[in-house]
């Protein structure tokens, strides 16, 4: 049962802490706050932390999962080795996904995240909890976000010398799809609301979740390249 747990893990820097604190006060169960791990590097760090807390050896599990992930990753590279996979990325997600997604895209794929938008309505204290690793922009409206993207990265108007961010990938919700189309960018819906793709039993957390995300991102690129 829940009161017998040895540790509670809150996968959010802004949501769930109050509940975990009350649970600790009532049942004596400590808690930690961690970002949702996506992909091997983040999941390695997470499992190592948890294993050390309980005197366990996570190394065999980590090594096995890394072999699986990078095995698929390496074999998949043969299918698109002639593609340009050095992308710029803009993320538009809720507060729980913003930092984990940016970590995965930069660390595992080597892409450059130019903008990370957080769509939650947050207090100043909650915004501060998210600060530090990546520069975040807090905007809640679809048009507000679209204007910010176009202002930060205006399209070329035929200038000979133009610092353009291409190829560009917008990773957000279905609401950003039109903005992506208008800029000739790739797009993948991963954050609420999603109504341009069917998701029944797929998540992006952990090792296998990282593979799912890699598959979805690169699948979009290959479908466009044809």
Predicted region positions:
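An N-terminal assembly and electron-transfer interface module characteristic of large anaerobic redox
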Residues: 1-226
């Amino acid at each position: 049962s829940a009161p017998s747990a040895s540790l509670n893990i809150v996968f959010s820097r802004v949501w769930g802490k109050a509940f975990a604190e009350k649970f600790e006060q009532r049942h004596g169960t400590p808690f930690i706050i961690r970002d949702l791990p996506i992909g091997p590097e983040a999941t390695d760090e997470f499992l190592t932390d948890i294993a050390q807390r309980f005197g366990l050896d996570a190394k065999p599990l980590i090594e096995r999962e890394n072999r699986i992930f990078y095995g698929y990753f390496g074999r998949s590279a043969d299918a698109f080795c002639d593609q340009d996979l050095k992308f710029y990325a803009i993320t538009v997600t809720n507060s729980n996904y913003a930092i984990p997604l940016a970590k995965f895209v930069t660390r595992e794929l080597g892409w450059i995240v130019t903008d990370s938008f957080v769509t939650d309505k947050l207090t100043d204290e909650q915004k501060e909890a998210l600060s530090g690793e990546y520069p975040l922009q807090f905007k809640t409206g679809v048009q507000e976000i679209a204007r910010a993207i176009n202002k930060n990265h205006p399209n070329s108007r035929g200038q000979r010398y133009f610092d353009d961010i291409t190829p560009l990938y917008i990773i957000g919700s279905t609401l950003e799809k039109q903005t992506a189309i208008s800029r000739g960018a790739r797009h993948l819906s991963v954050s609420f609301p999603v109504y341009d793709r069917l998701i029944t039993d797929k998540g992006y957390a952990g090792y296998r979740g990282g593979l799912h995300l890699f598959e979805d991102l690169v699948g979009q690129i290959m479908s466009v390249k044809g």
